[in-house]
Amino acid sequence: MSTPDNRSVNFFSLFCRGQHYSKTWPLEKRLAPVFVENRVIKMTRYAIRFMPPIAVFTLCWQIALGGQLGPAVATALFALSLPMQGLWWLGKRSVTPLPPAILNWFYEVRGKLQESGQVLAPVEGKPDYQALADTLKRAFKQLDKTFLDDL
């Protein structure tokens, strides 16, 4: 995945963008066959919730049983890195430009929103997945589900 040249994205801002993208993306079942975001967001949320306690449990278990500290720390760090990997991936995905097939569909959905009387801000530059997430979220609130039939 490549990032657009007009946006400066540093390593740590990708985590914030990933968090925002996961909150913006509509978790609709009809989008799951086309976009992998549904699975990644669900697994990232699961990892954010359960991996820190698993890391603490792993450390305590190894120390209580007299195990070596090195493998326990490595296992705990791996468990703690899983949510970060998900957020990083979502952040990278959010700034990735849309491929041509999805770009056409993006403009069709925007057109349907404008036809229904919604006021939309003009698209600046090449649209990315974050713009798609914002548009889809608004479309699911404002339009009926038939706009997905063209997907």
From Swiss-Prot:
Q: Which GO terms describe its cellular component?
A: plasma membrane
Q: Where found in the cell?
A: Cell inner membrane
**Keyword set, alphabetical order:** Cell inner membrane, Cell membrane, Membrane, Transmembrane, Transmembrane helix
**Which coarse location class describes where this protein primarily resides?**
membrane
Q: Which residues lie on this side of the membrane: Periplasmic?
A: 66-68
TM region(s), chain numbering: 46-65, 69-91
Q: Which residues lie on this side of the membrane: Cytoplasmic?
A: 1-45, 92-151
* Topology class, membrane: Multi-pass membrane protein
Known InterPro entries for this protein? UPF0208 (IPR007334)
Family under the similarity heading: Belongs to the UPF0208 family.
**What is the name listed in the Swiss-Prot or TrEMBL entry for this protein?**
UPF0208 membrane protein YfbV
**The species this protein was found in:** Escherichia coli O6:H1 (strain CFT073 / ATCC 700928 / UPEC)
